[in-house]
Amino acid sequence: RSFLEFAGQMDCAQTALYLSACNIPSKEAHGRVVEFLTEPSLTALLQQPDTSKPKDLRNLVFMILMYDTAARCSELLDMKVCDLRLDAKHPIAYLHGKGRKIRTVPLLSKTVQHCKQYLRKFHPSTDCHSEAPLFFTVIHGTQQKMSPDTVAAFFAKYGRMAKSVCPEVPEHIHPHMMRHTRAMHLYQSGMPMVLLSQYLGHSQVETTMIYAHADTEMKRAAIQKADAVRGTKPVPDEIWADNEEMILKLSGLL
């Protein structure tokens, strides 16, 4: 329609075609489904890495930090060592989001412990003000920023492993699901929508409303399930049916 509108502005002979197109009803838009992990699913996922192996330790810390900060995958991959302030009175992480916006996210004490363990293993001699990539891979002896494909691969791997021990785990796990999971858990815990929007780095609160809609749908499904169970119970017989004397008594006529 935008193209036809433009064509009509350039050539008035095309205006009729544009007006005809405007009469075509738009396809009904369906709400976006928010995929997130339940508490048992999240626990099962985080239990899969074998932290005795360096790569698994790295992957675990990546997933923990991703959940705690609700960061986008690209934001975490862009993090540098200097973006962590673990020894501050209130530990924080700096995330470089869309539009070059930087937001400050508080870190839980357990996350700080995991990050310190990771830094001791992967950045033992790196200064805390270093701009070296926080998460990296080594290719031909050279450290390079970890790629999105690497992240997607280990999420899928641990997702399959978690599925075998926890049926609640979704069939396909992807990195962005961790951001959705943290957002849903915070919303369900009572975080105000405006604050959640700032936490996620959304430019508009309307974008964050998908979590409210998703939570409402969950409640609706639970209510419908309860009604379905109630509907299976037998309806009690009407003891007054065909009993004229009882009907008269109930009506106050006897």
Locate predicted features.
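Conserved catalytic core of the tyrosine transesterase superfamily
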Residues: 1-254
